[in-house]
Amino acid sequence: MIINKAMILAAGRGERMRPLTDTCPKPLISVDGAPMIDHILDHLEEIGVKDVVVNTSYLGDMLHEHLEKRASPTIHFSDEDRPLETGGGVVKALPAFGEEPFFVINGDVVWSDQKANCLKELSQSWKKDMQALLLMVPLDKARGYQGDGDYNMNSHGVLRQKEPGEKATYVFSGIQILRPSIFKGLEPGRFSLKAVYDGLEEKGELYGLELKGLWFHVGTPEHLASTREWFEQHKDQHGEKSA
């Protein structure tokens, strides 16, 4: 199935990236020669996505000014008076997607595909009976990440979140495909997508796909510096695609 619409979550404050985010929304911070959100949009355009919703709140005018200069894909804005978090932001934007599944991507995700496009692979792995498909990163492919992961995944791709004190095999990348119907009955407001994942997990309907490339945890200025250094060192590698 071809996934031809997407949403980029760009309304957050980026507290841990201060002081850089005091004057710039985090998705506009540059990595590998361009703002993080531009790399994401380039990858979406590459696989044929035509329409992208970007939610904004903190320093939203800067995102509008920057993104309105793009010729493609077509950008639609979902402006929030106050940040609605990941789940609430998606619910507010749902009318743009109709009944078809769509990508949801954090606006500060950085990855290196290594001659592939993980968004294309995610789209090709989507099955008509799926409700959610999350791109998962093995801990040894998560640069700068020092946590204990988020989920384990069985041979059928079914995800199970780790138990307290357990170390999981995968960390969630912030990249996914979701079906609009999973939000049916949810009231508009501020809430996290994790509440939706938890409900799907209980029914055995939360699926994952392993990222084949590298993913970079860009949470602080220190992480940003090390990520920029990595891309500078690898800029001459042919076929590298970053976001």
Predicted regions and their residues:
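N-proximal low-complexity "stem/linker" segments adjacent to membrane-targeting elements
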Residues: 1-19, 28
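Short catalytic helix/loop segments, enriched in acidic residues and glycine
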Residues: 23-36
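Catalytic-core segments of class I nucleotidyltransferases/pyrophosphorylases
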Residues: 101-103, 110, 115-127, 140-143, ...
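Short beta-strand-to-loop element that shapes/binds the nucleotide-sugar donor at the catalytic cleft/hinge
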Residues: 58, 133-150
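Conserved N-terminal catalytic core of the sugar/cofactor nucleotidyltransferase
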Residues: 1-8, 34-106, 110-112, 117, ...
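A generic "binding-loop/recognition-motif" signal
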Residues: 13, 24, 59, 212-214
